[in-house]
Curated annotation (Swiss-Prot):
The keyword Zinc applies. The lineage of its organism: Bacteria, Pseudomonadati, Pseudomonadota, Gammaproteobacteria, Alteromonadales. It comes from the Bacteria. InterPro entries: DNA_Rcmb_RecR, Rcmb_RecR, Rcmb_RecR_Znf, TOPRIM_dom, TOPRIM_RecR. Pfam families: RecR_C (PF21175), RecR_HhH (PF21176), RecR_ZnF (PF02132), Toprim_4 (PF13662). GO terms for molecular function: DNA binding; zinc ion binding. The keyword Zinc-finger applies. PROSITE patterns: TOPRIM. This is Recombination protein RecR. It comes from Shewanella amazonensis (strain ATCC BAA-1098 / SB2B). GO terms for biological process: DNA recombination; DNA repair. May play a role in DNA repair. It seems to be involved in an RecBC-independent recombinational process of DNA repair. It may act with RecF and RecO. Keywords: DNA damage, DNA recombination, DNA repair, Metal-binding, Zinc, Zinc-finger. A zinc finger (C4-type) spans 57-72. Residues 81-176 form the Toprim domain.
């Protein structure tokens, strides 16, 4: 069934979000139009402001409305000598929620993928190399995803770090806490065995 052109456009617009199919988009559109128009107006206003005002931190490339994000502008963390490289701003939030890392970040906004036209320049690797060569960084922690592209990206960046004389490490991969071995895939299990630690 076709709705009014504007309702159809709203449904199609909502489908641009990851994981939102036609039915989910229709439910969202109807919820906003039927029951909570104030929330819909607030959503539209916030979305409009975010799209025009949110950019990238000049130092780490995460999302921010300022020239520097809160971590890079922090007097305590902005000068930390440990730098963690991640693929997305969501990865920063995941690590921050653990509360264990107190260094700075560098957000690639993706991973190397030559077939998709994503090379070193698209990931800001010249900016990263400048920070490593410029001094002040003693350790680089690579926290890219454990995928073929994530591994290739980590190896590429590790070479840059070594040339700059910066110690480089990669986060461990393996069996999740609370996980049962029978449900762990063979690749993860192999990584766990290869990365085992003495007790």
């Amino acid at each position: 069934m076709k709705f009014s052109p504007l309702v159809d456009e709203l449904i199609q617009s909502l489908r641009c979000l990851p994981g939102v199919g036609p039915k989910s988009a229709q439910r969202m559109a109807f919820a906003l139009l039927e029951s909570d128009r104030k929330a819909g107006i607030r959503l539209a206003d916030t979305l409009s402001r975010a799209m025009s005002d949110v950019g990238h931190c000049q130092k780490c490339r995460t999302f921010t409305e300022q020239s520097l994000c809160p971590i890079c502008s922090s007097s305590r963390r902005g000068e930390a000598d440990t730098l963690c490289v991640v693929e997305t701003p969501a990865d920063v939030l995941a690590i921050e929620s653990g509360g264990h890392f107190q260094g700075r970040y560098f957000v690639l906004q993706g991973h190397l993928s030559p077939l998709d036209g994503i090379g070193p320049e698209e990931l800001g690797l010249s900016l990263l190399e400048g920070q490593l060569v410029g001094g002040g960084i003693s350790e680089l922690i690579l926290a890219t995803n454990p995928t073929v592209e994530g591994d290739a990206t980590a190896h590429y960046i590790a070479d840059i770090a070594r040339r700059a004389g910066v110690a480089v490490s990669r986060i461990a991969h393996g069996v999740p806490v609370g996980g049962e071995l029978e449900y762990v895939d063979s690749t993860t299990l192999a990584l766990s065995f290869n990365g085992r630690l003495p007790l």
